[in-house]
Design a protein with these regions (language model features):
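Alpha-helical transmembrane bundle of multi-pass membrane proteins
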Residues: 1-30, 49-281
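Short, well-structured alpha-helical segments
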Residues: 38-47
Length: 281
């Protein structure tokens, strides 16, 4: 797939402008919009690249206009891991065994999780642009919340076997359709050009640290809370993730980086103003 994309996926307009190929960038923008849209967007890109044409220090990430975006990116990266789905992949044998499956049934269930993950990841590709990033994130967080509560209830009530398998497969399907691909799309879209490299590095670091903590804390959680309590905890985390996305994450579909930066900066200013004591105003 990577080799195929190397020949068929076009370069981004920003890269073309940066490489001195403004005419090709204009032509590409005209393919997805009008000539007026292409001209306006090209001007915004050129203005941004001229402004950002200097070496960026890590301290830039703490600037008032940039910091809220970096925080959103890191929270999304951590949430993608702490939603708990990788526990199912990493500890599938233990989870299915505790649900009453024998060795043969456990192996078949693990194969089923891989197939479901692949199918729904491919199905997500057209939906990201059709439905929108924010809606998919909200659907994923809310769907996983409900499913984890049901799994916790099943373990708590001693309901084993196929009901647990169906719920686990549903959780994987929702994750593969939403949080798994959309998180990376958002991370690639929300950061301004001048800090994208640094911010993406920080977001990726946060994601893998979260993955490490998730993977190595599940045995401890499972030992102290049991499967029911562990999945209930992941359900609470997903509910918190839903609230965070609802309040803080804008829709990036069809929004330029320049407009998105202004929108998030205005949102940050509004929040700061609302939390400032009246005596200080």
């Amino acid at each position: 797939m990577c080799i195929r994309d190397r020949f068929f996926v076009p370069e981004s307009p920003r890269w073309l402008v940066k490489a001195g190929k403004a005419d090709r960038a204009r032509a590409m923008l005209q393919r997805i919009g009008s000539a007026e849209y292409a001209g306006q967007t090209l001007k915004e890109i050129e203005h941004t690249l001229q402004k950002d044409n200097h070496k960026v220090a890590w301290s830039t990430l703490l600037q008032p206009q940039i910091k809220p975006i970096v925080i959103i990116g890191m929270v999304l990266a951590v949430f993608q891991q702490w939603c708990g789905i990788n526990v199912i992949f990493n500890y599938a044998q233990e989870i299915f065994a505790s649900a009453g499956f024998d060795i043969n049934g456990t192996l078949k269930s693990i194969v089923a999780t891989g197939i479901i993950n692949l199918v729904f990841t491919l199905a997500a590709l057209p939906l990201v642009d059709k439905i929108g990033r924010r809606k998919l994130m909200l659907f994923g967080a809310s769907g996983l919340t409900v499913i984890y509560v049901l799994i916790a209830g099943a373990y708590g009530l001693g309901i084993m076997g196929w009901p647990v398998l169906v719920l686990v497969l549903a959780a994987i399907a929702i994750y593969a359709l939403t949080l798994a691909p959309v998180t990376w799309v958002l991370l690639s879209e929300i950061f301004p050009n001048r800090v994208r490299g640094l911010a993406m590095s920080l977001g990726t670091l946060a994601l893998w640290i979260a993955c490490f903590l998730l993977t190595y804390t599940f045995p401890l959680l499972n030992a102290s809370l049991g499967a029911s309590g562990s999945f209930l905890l992941y359900g609470v985390i997903c509910a918190m993730g839903f609230i965070y996305v609802l309040r803080n994450v804008p829709e990036t579909k069809g929004v330029t980086l320049e407009a998105l930066e202004e929108q998030l900066a205005a949102q940050h200013t509004k929040v700061c103003a609302s939390t400032q004591p009246r005596s200080a105003r």
